[in-house]
């Protein structure tokens, strides 16, 4: 029997509709939520991501400011622009699209964003606050994954969860959110010895390591929930995740597809973070 599909597009549509209503109420009160997106260089994938984020804002009643710069923009000029956005009352969230050109220190740039406008949740103030369970913002991708688990009413308390991938953007915050939900969490990576020894006992697997087919049917517990965060290309050039979808869907209880799974939820939670920033500033959060 095939696994139940957790449809990221459908869930994102539902959450965005609710966000649009909240945004309309804010706008009517003179506080339209605003997101500034900063893109440096001409990376094709980054251009697609930025375009999707700006469109999501426009489609749901948010103000968006797209700041495009050539790849040779100096670090000092980028920091100066971020300072301007920090002080712009129309902007409630600032997103700097990664990766940045090599001559720019991405850590320094992310730390320059005011924590109350750090809607990606990457600033050390928010990353640290996540440890205590009280961040201003949760990183968008793991936040979206948690919403997907919530949508199937999965009982995380006491569940065994394995996160494959330990990045600051997904793996580490994902593990922290699962811990806070009461799960027993193991973090693995691409170099973990005997990955199967960990995943075969997992009730929930989150694959976020960026390696195609690292999760196969033979290492998944029957009935497990499998969340695929990976973004790769198969031999035909088609988008695929870290999970062997065709095989694993015959074993798992629930599974997310790629595309149409975590991706739409990531942008949706960016809207939610921006909305909450605007509500806080308006004094109604």
UniProtKB/Swiss-Prot annotation:
Gene3D superfamilies: Leucine Dehydrogenase, chain A, domain 1, NAD(P)-binding Rossmann-like Domain. One of its GO terms (cellular component) is cytosol. InterPro entries: Aminoacid_DH-like_N_sf, NAD(P)-bd_dom_sf, THF_DH/CycHdrlase, THF_DH/CycHdrlase_cat_dom, THF_DH/CycHdrlase_CS, THF_DH/CycHdrlase_NAD-bd_dom. Its EC number is 1.5.1.5, 3.5.4.9. Keywords: Amino-acid biosynthesis, Histidine biosynthesis, Hydrolase, Methionine biosynthesis, Multifunctional enzyme, NADP, One-carbon metabolism, Oxidoreductase, Purine biosynthesis. NADP(+) binds at residues 165-167, 190. Transmembrane segments: none annotated. It comes from the Bacteria. GO terms for biological process: L-histidine biosynthetic process; methionine biosynthetic process; purine nucleotide biosynthetic process; tetrahydrofolate interconversion. CDD domains: NAD_bind_m-THF_DH_Cyclohyd (cd01080). It catalyses: (6R)-5,10-methylene-5,6,7,8-tetrahydrofolate + NADP(+) = (6R)-5,10-methenyltetrahydrofolate + NADPH; (6R)-5,10-methenyltetrahydrofolate + H2O = (6R)-10-formyltetrahydrofolate + H(+). GO terms for molecular function: methenyltetrahydrofolate cyclohydrolase activity; methylenetetrahydrofolate dehydrogenase (NADP+) activity. Pathway: One-carbon metabolism; tetrahydrofolate interconversion. The keyword Transit peptide does not apply. Disulfide bonds: none annotated. Belongs to the tetrahydrofolate dehydrogenase/cyclohydrolase family. Homodimer. Catalyzes the oxidation of 5,10-methylenetetrahydrofolate to 5,10-methenyltetrahydrofolate and then the hydrolysis of 5,10-methenyltetrahydrofolate to 10-formyltetrahydrofolate. This is Bifunctional protein FolD. It comes from Cupriavidus metallidurans (strain ATCC 43123 / DSM 2839 / NBRC 102507 / CH34). The lineage of its organism: Bacteria, Pseudomonadati, Pseudomonadota, Betaproteobacteria, Burkholderiales. The gene is folD.
